[in-house]
């Protein structure tokens, strides 16, 4: 209670804590979306610009990312993830500037579904590229597949860097999808509390 005889009600304190928590969650989401956008873009550029030319028995062979379909898929997925994150960065910034909170269930479902889809795509892209990279690095003696990375060392190293960067972007998307799940399902939890207070 203050000296003026006016106290703080528990509802006001809880509301202030919720606003502070909501601000922190939105800031975390914005930072994660910026990180995912940058990491996905770097991963796509690292892999898409990677080439190496080797001469094998007087024949020049150029290794490029389009030679492995898993790398093409990874570049496309990272491009999509970067564009998607950029769009949602704008949404986050506008929401923070307006001070608005997401109360629309259909919009929350759309954001949650989009985040889930992009998270699954990035995880699938990293998994496929990692499997192809393992074959390139280790070969497959039973199928008489040779170790490509012994020939194209620079190419394999840059692809490895791209896959590692894509893995970080993928982890970021999984975290973002967790935040969007929190934002969605808290809309359902608050209604029960409000309905219970009416009785």
From Swiss-Prot:
Pfam family membership, one: CASP_dom
Domain of life: Eukaryota
InterPro entries: CASP/CASPL, CASP_dom
Principal location class: membrane
Membrane-crossing segments per the record: 27-47, 70-90, 107-127, 165-185
The keyword Membrane is annotated on this UniProt entry: yes
Intervals, Cytoplasmic compartment: 1-26, 91-106, 186-199
Cellular-component GO terms for this entry: plasma membrane
UniProt-annotated location(s): Cell membrane
Keyword field contains Membrane: yes
Keywords: Cell membrane, Membrane, Transmembrane, Transmembrane helix
Residue numbers on the Extracellular membrane side: 48-69, 128-164
Membrane topology note: Multi-pass membrane protein
Subunit structure: Homodimer and heterodimers.
The family this protein is said to belong to: Belongs to the Casparian strip membrane proteins (CASP) family.
Protein name: CASP-like protein 2B1
Species the sequence originates in: Eutrema halophilum
């Amino acid at each position: 209670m203050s000296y003026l005889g006016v106290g703080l009600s528990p509802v006001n304190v809880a509301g202030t804590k919720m606003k502070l928590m909501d601000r922190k969650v939105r800031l975390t989401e914005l930072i994660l979306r910026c990180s995912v956008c940058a990491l996905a873009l770097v991963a796509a550029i690292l892999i898409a610009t990677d080439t190496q030319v080797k001469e094998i028995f007087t024949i020049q062979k150029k290794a490029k990312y389009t030679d492995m379909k898993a790398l093409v898929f990874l570049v496309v997925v990272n491009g999509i993830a970067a564009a998607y994150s950029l769009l949602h960065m704008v949404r986050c910034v506008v929401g923070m500037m307006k001070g608005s909170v997401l109360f629309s269930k259909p919009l929350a479902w759309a954001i949650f579904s989009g985040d889930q889809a992009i998270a699954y795509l990035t995880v699938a892209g990293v998994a496929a590229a990692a499997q192809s990279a393992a074959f390139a690095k280790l070969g497959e003696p039973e199928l008489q597949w040779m170790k490509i990375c012994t020939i194209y060392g620079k190419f394999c190293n840059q692809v490895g860097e791209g896959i590692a960067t894509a893995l970080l972007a993928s982890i970021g998307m999984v975290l973002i999808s967790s935040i969007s799940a929190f934002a969605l399902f808290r809309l359902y939890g608050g209604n029960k509390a409000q309905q219970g207070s009416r009785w």
